Structures are given as structure tokens and as C-alpha cells.
Curated annotation (Swiss-Prot):
One of its GO terms (molecular function) is beta-1,3-galactosyl-O-glycosyl-glycoprotein beta-1,6-N-acetylglucosaminyltransferase activity. Pathway: Protein modification; protein glycosylation. Glycosyltransferase that can synthesize all known mucin beta 6 N-acetylglucosaminides. Mediates core 2 and core 4 O-glycan branching, 2 important steps in mucin-type biosynthesis. Also has I-branching enzyme activity by converting linear into branched poly-N-acetyllactosaminoglycans, leading to introduce the blood group I antigen during embryonic development. One of its GO terms (cellular component) is Golgi membrane. It is found in: Golgi apparatus membrane. One of its GO terms (biological process) is protein glycosylation. It is an enzyme of class 2 (transferase). The gene is GCNT3. This is Beta-1,3-galactosyl-O-glycosyl-glycoprotein beta-1,6-N-acetylglucosaminyltransferase 3.
Length: 440
């Protein structure tokens, strides 16, 4: 009897042990299954698994950007003044402590591209089929501050998009090499085939974009729209939001285009010459070709592929391009004028009803010092919480809530040397929204 009881206990023990092992294996298999379903190398963008909360959590855990400072970004994006004040105070301390990443840092970290992309948390797969089917082209003109460039590229990067980078010929060699090292890690990012020395307010700024336009049109990527950026820009929309906004344009372009003031008209009254800087001459210019009225705007555009093709190929566009080459800051009236030219795809008539301000266009959100003031008294926006450079606000954390209320795709200017916290919070906001589709 004792032996029989012992055998029963032994059998019962083996049964419980086997059951426990089976349950453990089942849990491991379930976890492995969930992980496999969230494997970024074999994602089905339309599957329930990819859309599941569990999968999104796994993705966000792997792609969440590491916070450099303990600040309340959720509160800052909502306009919580206590969170803003704390971040501004924190920023004063950061200025004394944190130095931006150097050219050498990027030259070293990009020796192993996979490690670089993983460590810097680049999103290396499309986040939706809608984004996959609507590639965007970028013309990125840079000349300094390598960290600004890398963080901008990371923020706008998606593997289905295509990116042309133009580096100022005058930039230091170490900067050029660092840019080359970064873009060598991505098959869809390349250096412009022709580089020019960029002189402030001269034709060369336009030529840099034109060089990228030519290269991008030769790419096999079937991009739909072109956005141009500089080193102090940053997106304020996710790639998915950009795709939606561009689809809503339905082939139209979006850029500032207004009647010029008398002061602005002086920019194309006389010819300018370029050496190492732009110089005014006493030579008067002829009227613009084809009796085209000149409009004014800014350097930034959201342009359809057809618009870009006509910039480069249409004889009337080429005549206008030749005419503006010796004007002051031609990027601020060439695109604005082409946007009103009747032969340009996606343009609008030059009737006053079609004037469009920088606040109405979606290309770029900028705070101009001369327009800042009391919103309750009619000012378009409140004073800059950062500092000003050439009468333009370099944003601080106090501007972020306002920035995110606007419909623009990108904003200008940002500089981590001025306020790194606003960039950290914007990066965190965009990454969370890209993965979950919701705000912080």
C-alpha cells in the first residue's frame, strides 16, 4: 500500500511537472509568436498583427528616442506653462553642459552603418501602405552643424522616400566627409551630382535646389511631391500626415505667393553681382520675360512632380530663371512667380483672390520678429520664446504648443545650441505619433 501511494504521488508529481513545462512552453511560444509578428523585416502593413496595440508597443519600445533631459514633453506640447518654465530653466543648465555631436562623432559611428541606424533610431520600414504608395522627394541644402542635419534626416526619413543632399562647396572638409558618411548608410539618400558654393541671398541658393531637382527626376523612385529644406528646418508633421496633406493638394502646389511691397520690388530693379558676397550695381534690369508679373514669397515650396519638370524643361520657365539670376534673393520671388504662371502645373491665377501668405501655405512655419505681438490685439502670433536671427525666431520650448496647432509640414528655425529641449520634445512627439497615431 505504501509503495502504491508513493507511485501515485510520483505519477501525480510527474503530471504536474509536465503540465507546468507545457504551460511554460506555451507562454514562451506565444511571446515568440508576438515578437515574430512584429518582426520589422517581414511586416504585413495591412495585417491585424501590425495594427495591434501589442505590436505598436514593441515597435515604440525599439524606436523610442532616448531622452537627454528629464523634461515634461507631454505637458510642453499641450502648452502647460509650468512644464515650459521648468524646461526653460533646464535649458539654461544644458547650455553649460551639453555640446553638440561633432563631425568626428559621425565619422566614427557610421563605420558600422547598421549599428549607427539602430543606435540613432532611424525608422527603416514603411509604417503604412498609404505611405509606401506615396513616396516624397526631399532637396536638403546644408552647410554646417552636422547634428542638425542628422536629426532632420532622421525626423523625415522613410525608406520609400528619396533624399538629395546638397552641401555647400565652401563647407569644411570634415563636415562634407561627415555628411557623406551618414548618407552612405542609406540607399535612398545621395549627394547632389553637382555642388556649388552658396552665397547668402544670391542665385546659388536656387541653383542648389535645381541641381537636386535634376537628380531626383532621374531617380527610379516614383515620388509625387518635392519638399526643400535647409539645416535649421524640422518637420512638425509625421510622414503619414504629410502624405495625407499632399494627397489633399490633388496636384496643386503650396507656397507663399503675394504682391511685392515697394521695398521688395527694388530687389529686381538693378542687377547684382556675386563674388564672395552679393553686391548691388547701377545697371538697371529689363522687365521680366513674357509680361509675367513678379510675386514674392520665401525659399520654401511644396511642389508637384509635374511642376518640377516644368521648372527644368519649359522654355518660359527657363527664361524667367535666366532673368532672376542677377537679382537679390531670387529664391524669394522665383518660386512665388512660377506658382502664378499660367503654364505651370498646379499653379494658381495671378488674380489678387489667389494671393497666399506663408501662414496659409503649408510649406514652412516661420515667426517673423516684425509680426510678433499680442494675439488678442490682432498679432498673428505671440513673441518668440527663443532668440532671433535675421529677424526670424529660433524657437524655444514656449513656442512648441503654438507650432503644433498649425497646418504646415515643417517649421523654421531650430538650433540645439539655442534650445535643445524644444527639439527633444518635438522629436518625442513625432515619434510617438508616427507609431501610435496619437499625440503624447
Amino acid at each position: 500500500m505504501k509503495m502504491t501511494g508513493w507511485k501515485k504521488k510520483l505519477c501525480r508529481g510527474h503530471h504536474l511537472w509536465a503540465l507546468g513545462c507545457y504551460m511554460l512552453l506555451a507562454v514562451v511560444a506565444l511571446r515568440l509568436s508576438l515578437r515574430l509578428k512584429c518582426d520589422v523585416d517581414s511586416l504585413d502593413l495591412e495585417s491585424r498583427d501590425f495594427q495591434s496595440q501589442r505590436c505598436r508597443d514593441v515597435l515604440y519600445k525599439n524606436l523610442k528616442l532616448p531622452a537627454k533631459r528629464s523634461i515634461n514633453c507631454s505637458g510642453i506640447t499641450r502648452g502647460d506653462q509650468e512644464a515650459v518654465v521648468q524646461a526653460l530653466l533646464d535649458n539654461l543648465e544644458v547650455k553649460k553642459k551639453r555640446l553638440p555631436f561633432t563631425d568626428t562623432y559621425y565619422l566614427n559611428i557610421t563605420r558600422d552603418c547598421e549599428q549607427f541606424k539602430a543606435q540613432r533610431k532611424f525608422i527603416q520600414f514603411p509604417l503604412s501602405k498609404e505611405e509606401l504608395d506615396f513616396p516624397i522627394a526631399y532637396s536638403m541644402v546644408v552647410h554646417e552643424k552636422i547634428e542638425n542635419f542628422e536629426r532632420l534626416l532622421r525626423a523625415v526619413y522613410a525608406p520609400q522616400n528619396i533624399y538629395c543632399v546638397h552641401v555647400d562647396v565652401k563647407s569644411p572638409e570634415t563636415f562634407k566627409e561627415a555628411v557623406k558618411a551618414i548618407i552612405s548608410c542609406f540607399p535612398n539618400v545621395f549627394m547632389a551630382s553637382k555642388l556649388v558654393p552658396v552665397v547668402y541671398a544670391s542665385w546659388s541658393r536656387v541653383q542648389a535646389d535645381l541641381n537636386c531637382m535634376e537628380d531626383l527626376l532621374q531617380s527610379s523612385v516614383p515620388w509625387k511631391y518635392l519638399l526643400n529644406t535647409c539645416g535649421t528646418d524640422f518637420p512638425i508633421k509625421t510622414n503619414a500626415e504629410m502624405v495625407l496633406a499632399l494627397k489633399m493638394l490633388n496636384g496643386k502646389n503650396s507656397m507663399e505667393s503675394e504682391i511685392p511691397s515697394e521695398y521688395k520690388k527694388t530687389r529686381w530693379k538693378y542687377r547684382y553681382e556675386v563674388t564672395d558676397r552679393l553686391s548691388l550695381t547701377s545697371k538697371m534690369k529689363d522687365p521680366p520675360p513674357d509680361n509675367l508679373p513678379v510675386f514674392t514669397g520665401n525659399a520654401y515650396f511644396v511642389a508637384s512632380r509635374a511642376f518640377v519638370q516644368h521648372v527644368l524643361e519649359n522654355p518660359k520657365s527657363q527664361r524667367l530663371i535666366e532673368w532672376v539670376k542677377d537679382t537679390y534673393s531670387p529664391d524669394e520671388h522665383l518660386w512665388a512667380t512660377l506658382q502664378r504662371a499660367p503654364w505651370m502645373p498646379g499653379s494658381v491665377p495671378y488674380h489678387p483672390k489667389y494671393h497666399i501668405s506663408d501662414m496659409t501655405a503649408i510649406a514652412r512655419l516661420v515667426k517673423w520678429q516684425g509680426h510678433e505681438g499680442d494675439v488678442s490685439m490682432g498679432a498673428p502670433y505671440a513673441p518668440c520664446s527663443g532668440i532671433h536671427q535675421r529677424a526670424i525666431c529660433i524657437y524655444g520650448v514656449g513656442d512648441l504648443h503654438w507650432i503644433l496647432q498649425n497646418h504646415h509640414l515643417l517649421a523654421n528655425k531650430f538650433d540645439p545650441r539655442v534650445d535643445d529641449n524644444v527639439l527633444q520634445c518635438l522629436e518625442e512627439y513625432l515619434r510617438h505619433k508616427a507609431i501610435y497615431g496619437t499625440e503624447l
